[in-house]
Each structure stands twice: as structure tokens, then as C-alpha cells.
Amino acid sequence: MDYQEGGIYMKKSLTAVLAFGASFGVLAACGSETNSGSEETVITVGTEATYPPFTYKDKGELTGYDIDVLNEAAERAGYTLEFEAMDFKGLVPALDAERIDLIANQMSITPERQEKYSFSDPYAISGAQVIVGSDNEDIQGIDDLEGKVVGSTQGSVYAQMAEEAGAEVKFYKGANQVLQDLQVGRLDAALNDRLFILTELEKTGYDVKAVGDVFNQSQAGFMARQDSDVLEGLNEALAEMKEDGTMEEIGEKYFGEDISQ
């Protein structure tokens, strides 16, 4: 998961919040006093906002599966969210620099990341799949990528998968650019999340197709620094949402199925 992890491109209006996200970065995840005298936990969240149906803008408003899940979980936990949109490659550096406190962008939970970061409990389960031009019959799956040029975004788990398959990886800013170059033959293939492929390829109209089996099942979680104290509240809310059917409802909205388990 993650296309931008990781890609290309509905609850609360966050347009104004995005505009002020950067200025509130230094206040993130710290307590501020409300008018009632209670302490408010404000979390600055980094997201790509160009990876539908997970995180994207619809008529200027931030929306998507990840955003809906986090909004609901934060409301139940009593947290206030401030969103900051940025390129995928800037998400982890922003977390390291404490500009943001949390990443909501289909971040795959991997052993390598867990060595340095903390994750919420998984809220999405998926896998990877290969994408090629619609007239490409040579590539039928991950095993055919050796020596091929594969498009991805920097820092993506899909870039790592392509490299491990022996491909030459060409990096792009986002999935739009990857698919554009793929359909005109500048790339041999791309890798992405099977849920992204399931929901977006038909909508976008790119002259590409998915090939081969889904592989490398992965789980996505909200990613934070190891010293984060907000994940416990989010995990309690996520468990409630799975139990009362809210997660299933959000999954049905975007994918026609529950992708949380």
C-alpha cells in the first residue's frame, strides 16, 4: 500500500485546515486549553491528497478512505486534526522533523519502518499488482520485471519490490505521471495497490491494465514517531469502529467491501 506508496488520486470540510496546517505544525500533538478549561490534543497530519480513493481532494475538500477513517477515529478519541498536504516523498522527512505528528497515506506496516516508527493498528489490508500498457503481452506479473523500466514514487514499498524483482526504477512525483508515461511507452510497467487499481483505473481512462495475481499482502496503519502518545486513543477508536460496523461502512463507500480485516 502506500504509493506515493506510497499514487494518483468523502464527513468534514478541511479546506481551511489544510491552508493553516504548516503554521500549526509546532503545536501538533501537544495540549492546548479550550474555552471550557479542558486540554485539547491537536494532531498535525501529513497526507498526499493526490492518491484516490485513499486521500484526495474533491471540489477542494480533503476526502478519501484514509481521511474518513482518521476523522472518525480522532473524533471518538477526542483529538483535533490539522492536515498538511505534501508530496509523498516529503511525508517521512516531515515526521522526522516534527513538522507533522502522523502520516495518513496508506503507509504499509513493514519491519524496516517499525524499527524507527510506531504504527496504529491496521485499518486497511491489501496487496500489490503489476500494471502495464493495454497492448503489452510480454509482462504477465512480478516475475517478468527483471531488466524492465518500472515507474514508482521515491520511498514507496512498490519501488523496493520492483528493485528486488530486478527492474530499473524510474521515480515520479505521483501516480498520474507514472500512468501517463506508462500508456505512451516510456515505462514498461508500474506497481500499485490492488485497491487503487480496482477503483481508479476505470475512472481515469488511462490506456493501461492490471496483470498477474495480487501478491505481497500488506497492512496499512497511521504512522507516527516512536514517542507518540496519540496511537493508544486511535487504536481504541479503531477497535470500536470495527466492532460497530463503521469500518465496514466506510470500506463499502469506497470499495464495495470491508478492507479493514
Task: For each feature predicted by the language model, list its residue ranges.
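Extended ligand-binding regions for polar small-molecule ligands
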Residues: G31, I67-R76, Q154-S156, G221-Q261
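Extracytoplasmic small-molecule ligand-binding "clamshell" domains
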Residues: E39-Q106
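Periplasmic-binding protein-like
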Residues: A49, I125-V132, L198, E202-A239, ...
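Bilobed "Venus flytrap"/periplasmic-binding protein-like clamshell domains
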Residues: L62-E72, Q129-L179, R194-L198
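Acidic, polar ligand-binding/catalytic clefts
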Residues: T80-D144, V208-K209
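Short helix-initiation/N-cap motifs at beta->coil->alpha
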Residues: F83-L95, E137, G155, K170-V184, ...
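A ligand-binding cleft/hinge motif common to bilobed small-molecule-binding domains
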Residues: M107-E115, M161, D188-N216
